[in-house]
Amino acid sequence: EIASCLVGSEMCIRDRNTVIQFLQYPYEQVVAENFVEILEKMELINDLSCYEEIYGILKKEALDGRKVEQQIIEVGTKRELFFGKDRLDTVLHYKDYTYMKRKWTAYLKRERKKEPDWVEVMTLLEAFFPPVWRAIIRDEIFIGDWMPELCRFL
């Protein structure tokens, strides 16, 4: 007999002798941490799972843009990230960058996956990050809820 409970952001499953605890991580924080990783390492990034994780979340989960903005600022500040407009523009130009396309193809092959396509991943990042990044560099509060069904903010 297994009983499960949800406590705040923790979920535990109990049977007679074992307690397994799963800590849930807010999707906004996962997106922010992966995004900062991408901005830090740029094309020198070796593990492209950051891109895949962001893509998967943006395709399936509704997100609070304000929380994403706050998390990017918090994580970026801790890692001493430079918050300049050009930084995001450079990453978004990787959509047509042959080197990054090849890296993505190699990553998918290693992971034994055939999709998503690099251009599709980058198109979704282009839809999500520019308005959040603009608010960050202008020191504004971003208000917007990401709707995965529409692939845009409301």
Annotated model-derived regions:
Residues 1-8, 12-13:
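Single conserved hydrophobic/aromatic residue that forms the stacking wall/gate
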Residues 10, 14-23:
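Short, cationic low-complexity segments
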Residues 19-20, 38-41, 87-92, 112-113:
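A ubiquitous short alpha-helical element
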Residues 23-48, 52:
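Phosphate/pyrophosphate- and phosphate-bearing ligand-binding catalytic cores of soluble enzymes
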Residues 33-37, 52-58, 123-133:
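Short, hydrophobic/amphipathic alpha-helical patches that form generic packing surfaces
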Residues 42-44, 59-67, 132-138:
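Short helix-capping/linker segments at secondary-structure and domain boundaries
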Residues 51-98:
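Small-residue-rich helix-loop
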Residues 89-154:
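Long, low-complexity C-terminal extensions of enzymes
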